[in-house]
Amino acid sequence: MGKTPDWSRLEAYAGSMSKAEFEQAWQQIYSEKNGLPPPFKFTDTHLEVPTGQLAKTTCRIPFRADKEASTSDQKPSWRRARDLPPLEERPPLSDLHIALDPGHIGGSWAMMEERFLSFKPGEDIREGDLSLLTAKILKERLVKEGAIVSLVRESLDPVTTKRPADFEAESRKVLTDAGFPTPAASYQGLTGDAKLLTVQWQSEKLFYRVSEIHARGERVNQQIKPDVVLCLHFNAESWGDATSPQFSPKNHLHVLVNGCYSPGELQQQDVRFEMLLRLLSRVHEEEIPLATTVAESMARVTRLPAYLYSTPNARQAGSNPYVYARNLLANRLYECPVVYLEPFVMNHEETYHRLRGQHFLGRTLIGGKLVTSAIEDYVNGIVRGLLSYYQTNRPS
């Protein structure tokens, strides 16, 4: 579903970045830690990227010399903290446009998304519902601090106008091309790999994992045009059979920025283009310090330990143990700094009951222990982190 890249957008960054700056960003953020060479090459003078298009097979972007000023006047739509107008005794987030992206969809779609968790008949939590509630409370707090706040999703309905049925033909072709010429239409009564190899499962995945995120990307990039996006999620450990889920003893926090692209991912021309657009527009120079400050605040408020990635699809971004670089569709498509939050494990027993309590102020008794609202802690962690970052980095 990726768009055909407009390579002239990269060419507009000619002379904006030195080879040393490009190489550092590539090696420390955007590549896998011990990855293979990328499907593009750079010399002392320029970057050369295969486009995958017959009319123009390569895109060439000259580097600027180390001691020369930038020769590009290309400016992104978003603003760094240092580029915001002086505060002049106004609220600390004045002029800052924040988009809040509540993860997943929730509501009647939660079971399809596999973001529905219930340990007892008549009770459940749904990540899409929780993330939307968190976003609405967070918006109120941020507006009080002067921010302009837009919600990417405002209800328990999809942003995309497409539905799973729109992807049945494409899903059937995917399965046929993968060596399954007669895939089952429905996964009714199926589990495990057998369920994954059905037209229904593949169609649903294209709907909520791909089409929905592309629709949100269009809204962010074409309509909202914020200075920063906060993607609000709740994490989970494997809970086994959804009809008989298991609690996990683990509870943790991590924050994601964009990066850590595998050579295989970069073989796709749209992914290659989107990664280079982020790199050349220097999104990481704002995204990583902002994410780090928010992560530090979230850690203080929630008192959660850092999640530890053991897979090669993520790498630490900087020295903060809570912040990782990972290539996700949302943090790649949104053309501005994106802070992607993953606090709390929904199937951790205490967290599950805290989340069932929705949002409350103060403390309440859960499992014989006085606890705060997980959603209130989530909101407070973000607000304090944003205040710290922008009060430190914007003109006074």
Regions found by a protein language model. Name each.
Residues 97-101, 149-153, 227-232, 254-257, ...:
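Structural recognition of the beta-strand scaffold that forms the well-ordered cores
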